[in-house]
C-alpha cells in the first residue's frame, strides 16, 4: 500500500513562503523535490496550484478547493483533503507509485498532519524574511511534535549539504512513532 507523506522546505524560523510563493531559490532542493515526487500523485491546495502556474510534470496533480466550478487544467480538482487522499491512493495503487505526496500549502500540510506517515523536510540555513528584507504575510510549516515523530537516521542528513543558490540545506525524514 502506498505511503502518504508530506514534503516541504522551511527556513530557520519555519517559514514556508508568502502564501503565494517561496522566498528563496535553492536549485538542489528543487531537484530533490522533483526526484522524490516524480511518478507519484501530488496533492496541493488551490493557492499552491496557482503559484505553480500549471501542473507538475510526470505526476498526477490533485488540487483541493472549495470552489465547485474551479478548473485546473492538467489536474484533478476535489473539494476536500479526504477526497484528495482517496483519489491519490487509488492512483498510486493503479500506477505502482510508492508514495502520495502532500505538497502544500500551509493549511493543507497542517490539516494532513494526523493522516501522513512520513514528513520529508528540507531545512534551509537561511532566515528568508530577514534576507529578503520583507515584511508582510508569511506562512509557517506545522510544528513537528517529537512525541509523535522521530527522525529516520537512514534518510536524514547528518551534515549540511553544500550551498545551492541562496542557502546550504539538509533533509530530515520524520517517521510517525
Across the structure, where does each feature detected by a protein language model lie?
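Enzymes that bind and transform nitrogen-containing heteroaromatic metabolites
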Residues: 1-177
Amino acid at each position: 500500500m502506498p505511503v502518504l507523506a508530506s514534503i516541504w522546505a522551511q527556513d530557520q524560523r519555519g517559514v514556508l513562503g508568502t502564501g503565494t510563493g517561496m522566498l528563496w531559490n535553492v536549485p538542489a532542493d528543487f531537484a530533490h523535490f522533483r526526484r522524490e515526487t516524480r511518478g507519484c500523485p501530488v496533492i496541493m491546495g488551490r493557492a499552491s496550484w496557482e503559484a505553480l502556474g500549471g501542473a507538475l510534470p510526470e505526476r498526477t496533480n490533485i488540487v483541493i478547493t472549495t470552489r465547485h466550478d474551479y478548473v485546473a487544467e492538467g489536474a484533478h480538482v476535489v473539494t476536500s483533503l479526504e477526497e484528495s487522499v482517496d483519489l491519490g491512493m487509488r492512483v498510486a495503487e493503479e500506477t505502482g507509485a510508492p508514495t502520495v505526496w502532500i505538497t502544500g500549502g500551509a493549511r493543507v500540510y497542517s490539516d494532513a498532519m494526523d493522516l501522513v506517515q512520513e514528513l520529508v523536510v528540507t531545512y534551509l540555513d537561511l532566515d528568508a524574511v530577514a534576507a529578503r528584507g520583507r515584511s508582510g504575510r508569511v506562512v509557517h510549516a506545522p510544528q513537528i511534535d517529537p512525541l509523535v515523530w522521530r527522525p529516520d537516521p537512514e534518510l536524514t542528513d547528518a551534515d549540511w549539504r553544500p550551498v545551492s543558490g541562496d542557502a546550504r540545506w539538509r533533509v530530515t525524514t520524520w517517521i510517525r512513532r
